[in-house]
Amino acid sequence: MQVLSSLRSAKNRHKDCIVVRRRGRVYVICKSNPRFKAVQGGKKKKG
């Protein structure tokens, strides 16, 4: 899975790619071609 600062180009790589939000991060998932998976958003500091 790639960690990207912008998912603008990642969501247009394949026709089956969809953008979802989970636990404060934005993911691009592609079930037909899993190599296009990507995530935006890193770790948050606690405290």
Curated annotation (Swiss-Prot):
It comes from the Bacteria. Signal peptide: none annotated. GO terms for cellular component: ribonucleoprotein complex; ribosome. One of its GO terms (molecular function) is structural constituent of ribosome. Keywords: Ribonucleoprotein, Ribosomal protein. GO terms for biological process: translation. SUPFAM superfamilies: Ribosomal protein L36. Belongs to the bacterial ribosomal protein bL36 family. This is Large ribosomal subunit protein bL36B.
